[in-house]
């Protein structure tokens, strides 16, 4: 009997565990089903949003008792992650609140917590979407208009804070302004005087704020035909127009209007007092931007009209399209499909809106959100999905960009070149070049012929020289790149008169016979240190002729491909390091690469990148070489600045990596110390596993890491000082010479150079910002020419 009872007890225990697992599994299934229903509400094409909502409310109401927390979390996540369905979810919450007042209060508290947490963690978009959601709950009779106005007033109070960056004040004003299209009508009807008071405070702030940064962020230096408005100014103009129209907009879907008779009976909740977190030095706020405009209604002759630049519909459409790109940019096909499935596509010229928004992203200053190729690949997919209309709109946009290129920002010029060459390569390099042949009459430094020349150079990287020659009309011959072949001077007819020819020929034979690096060093010993025509590059600390013979001979032998060149450099790495002991020697190496490969820009870029990776040349040497007299003829060509930017990025990545490693080591050290002190105090065996001795870095290791980081910071600062000092020198010299000769200094060369200076500031703004006070003290002083000083002041204003 005792055995049977024991067996029965075991069966009961097993059944209990199995039933518990089944309940957990069933609960998980229900939770997943609820999440799926909430996420997909309003997306069924077979029934209306309103009937979707009614059905979902019935389901959720029945499950509130068991899955309350899960439903709260899903709804608050949807509010932040799916802002395009904001009004659908606010209606859902409103209907639930009408049936269950307690749940409505819990949701408001949960949403307020999400909003405050987003502000605290500097998740600015999430905070703005949370605020919008709270505001739209006023329309659904969940939140009182009075308490929302108190919150908006509190946010505008930030605009009066002293000693905080303007970008902080700007964001809080922007967050309030961008919320008003959703709730403005309701506030106007219920609290008109309070709304007007709020708008007056915003206007006072906007009138007094600095816009020093504006010119640095413009795509074009001219406002014709479309003004380039600063984002807050543009949104304020749109809100003012909306106010003139009595807050009636035509874009936002408002499903709650159908349920007004139900919602107006519900009790409302008051928002608690919400105080924005105070500013901290480690807070990073969104930078200002300029609203990009390419089209107006005259560019869209057929179909629906494009909303005006100051209509709130333009803002809402653009924001929605930007959000689609943000959500789907990882998958170009999905992104293109979603853009073309825009919910209001029959009310607007959708293709024009999409193209304008994509170029707005591509030309966004200081840097685009995503890689250039991301936007190019999305445009290609759009052309495939909409072949009847989108290619024509894109061609029209390209024509507009080309005609306005004279005043285009230098950074945007580069992006335009990169995009257009990539686009051509995907469409058989077909273009109506004859329509642009008027540019052939212009000076070579003018942006139009320069654009075509740079596009062809980029196309060469994506194709081959004969293909480029065949695709272009004969009239464009002077803009077609040279055949990319090495110019090995020791094989030329005049080589017999060159001092290193004999050794060069000896070196060719030795390398072909697979000699060792040591044997190369022995051969090079025979080269005398004098009698070299390029000796003026040397200060006597290195043998310029030895570098000349070795670099040109080795790279010529490896000229068959990038791989051959890389293999040659790697094999004779020790020889390079021995020859490149000083910065002057490194500059000499770079000069010889240019001399050999002057007709192959891409080869120069990849070779110099390789030399930097192998630490054969320093970043500072590359910067000095770029600004040397030998490179004057190349100074306005894109590839040279591509080299400079990859050099700066390499230095920046090195500093960031060391910083990250040091922070990680310090954290481990602190945790190890904390763990050891806990082990002394804590007698419990149920504590976390402490960091082992092997994981714990010693204090000496941390000190060495600090020294390495300090040295890297010194090198980084030196690199920026070299670059900016050289810019100041050549620009000051040009301005002084123009003034002395009585000439207009505003030449094509000057605009390219000042544009490149601005580009360095903006492309590397996060790293340059650290040294802004040093730059102001040493280089950008008050006695500097205002044209140069303004570039620095505009850069500083971005984070001011």
UniProtKB/Swiss-Prot annotation:
SUPFAM superfamilies: ARM repeat. Keywords: mRNA capping, mRNA processing, mRNA splicing, Nucleus, Phosphoprotein, RNA-mediated gene silencing. GO terms for molecular function: mRNA binding; RNA cap binding. It is found in: Nucleus. Residues 1-26, 669-700 are annotated as: Disordered. It holds the Pfam family MIF4G_like_2. It comes from the Eukaryota. The modification Phosphothreonine is found at residue 9. The keyword Nucleus applies. GO terms for cellular component: nuclear cap binding complex; nucleus; postsynaptic cytosol; presynaptic cytosol. InterPro entries: ARM-type_fold (IPR016024), CBP80 (IPR027159), MIF4G-like_typ-1 (IPR015172), MIF4G-like_typ-2 (IPR015174), MIF4G-like_typ-3 (IPR003890). Residues 31-243 form the MIF4G domain. GO terms for biological process: 7-methylguanosine mRNA capping; mRNA export from nucleus; negative regulation of viral genome replication; nuclear-transcribed mRNA catabolic process, nonsense-mediated decay; primary miRNA processing; regulatory ncRNA-mediated post-transcriptional gene silencing; RNA splicing; siRNA processing. Belongs to the NCBP1 family. Component of the nuclear cap-binding complex (CBC), a heterodimer composed of Cbp80 and Cbp20 that interacts with m7GpppG-capped RNA. Component of the cap-binding complex (CBC), which binds cotranscriptionally to the 5'-cap of pre-mRNAs and is involved in various processes such as pre-mRNA splicing and RNA-mediated gene silencing (RNAi). The CBC complex is involved in miRNA-mediated RNA interference via its interaction with Ars2 and is required for primary microRNAs (miRNAs) processing. Also involved in innate immunity via the short interfering RNAs (siRNAs) processing machinery by restricting the viral RNA production. This is Nuclear cap-binding protein subunit 1. The gene is Cbp80.
